[in-house]
């Protein structure tokens, strides 16, 4: 623990809060255009082919965002809406694409947690 004199000489530095989603610029969602749609593999204990898209946002940021749910209709030049939220086992993926909005279709035959995947209520 520092002495009073040490604190006078060199005061305590306030902690800097890092922004986890800088490309959003304090917006809840942002629109963008897919520049590349591809699959990638997760970090060590997990194994899969995760679907991700490189998205060029309206504020000229280029980000990698995750495509949730089973199956998707995205391709290059698809217009998508993204939200913040990282994918723990994909390094560098800090955003999610919102399903059922703009060019992204909702997940087909989804019965539970439908609102998260843009699926309509089944008849």
Curated annotation (Swiss-Prot):
A GO biological process held by the record: translation
GO cellular component assignments: small ribosomal subunit
A Pfam family: Ribosom_S12_S23
GO molecular function: rRNA binding; structural constituent of ribosome; tRNA binding
Region described as Disordered: 104-123
Keyword Transcription regulation appears in the UniProt entry: no
Modified residues (3-methylthioaspartic acid): 89
Ranges of compositional bias, category Basic residues: 110-123
UniProt-listed SUPFAM superfamilies: Nucleic acid-binding proteins
Keywords (A to Z) from UniProt: Methylation, Ribonucleoprotein, Ribosomal protein, RNA-binding, rRNA-binding, tRNA-binding
Family (UniProt): Belongs to the universal ribosomal protein uS12 family.
Alphabetized PANTHER family for the sequence: 30S RIBOSOMAL PROTEIN S12 FAMILY MEMBER (PTHR11652)
Subunit structure: Part of the 30S ribosomal subunit. Contacts proteins S8 and S17. May interact with IF1 in the 30S initiation complex.
Function: With S4 and S5 plays an important role in translational accuracy.
Protein name: Small ribosomal subunit protein uS12
């Amino acid at each position: 623990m520092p002495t009073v004199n040490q604190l006078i000489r060199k005061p305590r530095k306030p902690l800097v809060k890092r922004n986890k989603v800088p490309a959003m610029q304090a917006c809840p969602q942002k629109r963008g255009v897919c520049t590349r749609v591809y699959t990638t593999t997760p970090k060590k204990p997990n194994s899969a082919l995760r679907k991700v898209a490189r998205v060029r946002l309206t504020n000229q940021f280029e980000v990698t965002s995750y495509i949730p749910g089973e199956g998707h209709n995205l391709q290059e030049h698809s217009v998508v809406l993204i939200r913040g939220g990282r994918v723990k086992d994909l390094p560098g993926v800090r955003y999610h694409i919102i399903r059922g909005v703009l060019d992204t279709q909702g997940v087909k035959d989804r019965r539970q947690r439908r609102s998260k995947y843009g699926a309509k209520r089944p008849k």
